[in-house]
Amino acid sequence: MIEVRKFSLERMIEMTQPIFLKPVLQDKIWGGRKLELEFGLKGPSDTVGEAWCISAHPNGVSIVTSPAEYAGLGLDQLYQEHPELFGNPSQIVFPLLIKILDAAAELSVQVHPDDAYGLEHEGELGKTECWYVISAEPGAKIVYGHKAQSRQEFEDLVASGRWSDLLVEVPVKAGDFFDVPAGTIHAIGAGVVILETQQSSDTTYRVYDYDRRDTQGNPRDLHLKQAADVTFYPDPERHLQVKTQQVGDSQVIQYLENEFFTVTKWEVVDSLTLSLDNAYTLATVIAGQGRLWLDGVAYDLNLASSFILPNGVSEIRLEGTLTLISSHPA
């Protein structure tokens, strides 16, 4: 009985420490050097397109750097072996994936399946995602939706390569936010850097890739049938319901709450105290630097710092001038 109570107390102590993670850098044909030059994330090449900041997906597992007792563990292993840190969740796999993307060139025009299609055909979750635009070069744009009224019209426009008749292009600037549910035709344009919050899935169906070739000189695969299967017809309108809370000179802006996750920006000027009531919270610094105070202990936060506030953390204080994107599963 005494040993059980001691074990429980130790777990309570561990739960009040943030879990910091090392990102996994992914080389992409469309990637560049901004992750290295602007975020200090040096990868294996000059075409690093993605930093998987918080990930338990088998294609790129983030590694815990602190606290010391978990250092070196993959997030997937931590989630499986210490479910108490995550509120003993019902999800078998860690449900979210947080990325920073540097699009030096256009990404392919693509779409992702929902859970039902993804599990049946790919053996993994579908992929609903959303984007916060960290930076955008002048004239930058994205593909966000399509103009076809039916599957037949969609397939006809794709087959004839009438991309301007099919695709909806939207100009973007820093601070924009986009909800990208599964079934949405989309592509990030050249010169755009985003933070992406998504379901933990790596399934993408390409519709158009600008006739690019891979490093072996082969055309990149397209997935036209699967894309047509999962795309919305006609493309629905999407409206954000943004909630802004002013806290002194700081702001808390909730951009999105859906069946998979809630995404919020913490804009810190000098100091911001936050109360947390969800099972656990993910956060990544996208601008500035400062400190995280938790139970009287300060933790340095720098650009691209990514961490999880585990179950049991009910209040934090952020100090400095910095911006973070936070999220938690539904």
Name these PLM-found stretches.
Residues 1-149, 209-238, 263:
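Transition-metal
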Residues 93, 101-106, 115, 125, ...:
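Ligand-binding loop in jelly-roll beta-barrel domains
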Residues 100, 108-110, 130-132, 169, ...:
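Conserved hydrophobic/aromatic beta-strand scaffold that supports enzyme active sites
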Residues 132-154, 252-255, 268-279:
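Short beta-strand/loop turn elements enriched in aromatics
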Residues 156-164, 289-291:
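Short, structured beta-strand/loop micro-motifs enriched in basic residues and often containing a Trp
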Residues 160-166, 177-179, 185-239:
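An exposed, glycine/acidic-rich loop-and-rim segment of catalytic or binding clefts
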Residues 166-179, 294-313:
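Short acidic-glycine-tyrosine-enriched beta hairpin
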Residues 241-299, 303-305:
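Acidic/His-leaning functional-site neighborhoods
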